[in-house]
């Protein structure tokens, strides 16, 4: 609600509580994106029930799906609250308000912090140890949430712990842009193990040995070479092309044409182009046939085709089993949210 108590948006969360203890730890969890709902952590890692998908990336993503008890759920140690940001899950803006009002680095942190404050107050959990767990973009949202929660003059809320899962703590290292070399040497070891998995490298090394060597090459030779820009010698350039090709399974011609800088989408398309496949983004072990092998970008994310439906279906199945009934559709992700995200809203942030 705003200062006049008019409703702005509706947060619909999933919470699990195993006792009435008012000082039992509680953990607030969310996935990243921005634009992702929390079902991935909920049904894949933390919840009392999780969906079991094959670990060898061979599944085609078709039902039925196997919903199993999660012996590793932290529910025996803490109550769990899975947060779906506005525009994801069942959380929606209300009345005349639009999702864009909540879609930004600062806006997102403010509204989720306000939800956490209200949840603590409504559930009388002011004396409970509080933990925040964020995945991917949660590496940015999490620290901002801690700051927002601590900033309240009358409702200052301290957090006992912040847990980050594969965090995107620095967007510079994952966003490809002209002049930004960071993601190129940061991604290379992932390219290397992907090429190794798909049989595109000629080596007798084990996967771990190959991975460690690729990291060494990336940090000690490839990264410094990129920083030299046009000052790099032809001899060094040719050597980098050769080694880059060896580690990634891409042709030397393609590496040259990319000027040593291959973006992730290009790699996913090029690695298995000769076979007519592209590899997955979320999990590069998955591969899927492309309709047009000559295109620049993959037709789809093969990995999401492999397991996305399993998570969505498992969540609805679980909700049905525990008596949750709604005519709303659960929004697992929202591309419109990501495309309209305000990345500049923290420029005036005071730390």
PLM segments and residue spans:
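Asp/Glu-centered strand-loop micro-motifs enriched in Gly/Pro and often flanked by an aromatic residue
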Residues: 1-20, 121, 343-351
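Residue in the alpha/beta-hydrolase core beta-strand immediately N-terminal to the catalytic nucleophile
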Residues: 84, 131, 161-163
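Glycine-rich nucleophile elbow surrounding the catalytic serine of serine-hydrolase chemistry
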Residues: 134-147
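A catalytic-pocket lid/entrance helix-loop region that shapes and gates access to the active site
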Residues: 47-53, 58, 146, 150-249
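Alpha/beta-hydrolase fold catalytic core
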Residues: 228-351
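Alpha/beta-hydrolase fold nucleophile elbow
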Residues: 124-137
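N-terminal cap/lid subdomain of alpha/beta-hydrolase-fold enzymes
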Residues: 7-101
């Amino acid at each position: 609600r705003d200062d006049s108590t008019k409703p702005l948006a509706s947060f619909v969360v999933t919470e699990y509580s195993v006792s009435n203890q008012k000082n039992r730890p509680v953990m607030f969890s969310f996935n990243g994106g921005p634009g992702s709902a929390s079902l991935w952590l909920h049904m894949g890692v933390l919840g009392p029930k999780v969906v079991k998908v094959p670990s060898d990336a061979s599944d085609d993503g078709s039902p039925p799906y196997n919903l199993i008890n999660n012996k590793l759920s932290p529910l025996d140690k803490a109550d769990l609250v899975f947060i779906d940001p506005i525009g994801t899950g069942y959380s929606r803006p209300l009345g005349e308000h639009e999702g864009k009002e909540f879609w930004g680095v600062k806006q997102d942190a403010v509204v989720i912090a306000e939800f956490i404050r209200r949840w603590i107050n409504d559930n009388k959990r002011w004396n409970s140890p509080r933990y925040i767990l964020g995945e991917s973009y949660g590496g940015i949202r999490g620290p901002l949430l801690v700051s927002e929660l601590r900033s309240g003059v009358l409702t200052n809320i301290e957090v006992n712990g912040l847990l980050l899962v594969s965090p995107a703590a620095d967007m510079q290292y994952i966003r490809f842009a002209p002049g930004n070399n960071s993601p190129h040497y940061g991604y290379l070891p992932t390219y290397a193990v992907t090429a190794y998995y798909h049989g595109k490298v000629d080596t007798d090394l084990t996967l771990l040995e190959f991975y460690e060597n690729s990291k060494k090459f990336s940090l000690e030779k490839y990264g410094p070479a990129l920083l030299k820009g046009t000052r790099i010698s032809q001899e060094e350039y040719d050597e980098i092309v050769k080694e880059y090709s060896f580690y990634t399974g891409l042709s030397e011609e393609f590496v040259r044409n990319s000027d040593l800088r291959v973006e992730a989408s290009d790699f996913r398309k090029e690695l298995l182009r000769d076979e007519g496949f592209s590899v997955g983004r979320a999990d590069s072990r998955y591969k899927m046939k492309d309709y047009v092998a000559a295109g620049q970008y993959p037709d789809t994310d093969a990995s999401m085709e492999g397991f996305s439906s399993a998570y969505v279906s498992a969540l609805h199945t679980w909700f049905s089993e525990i008596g949750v009934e709604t005519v709303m559709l659960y929004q697992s992700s929202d591309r419109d949210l990501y495309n309209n995200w305000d990345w500049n809203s923290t420029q005036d942030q005071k730390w």
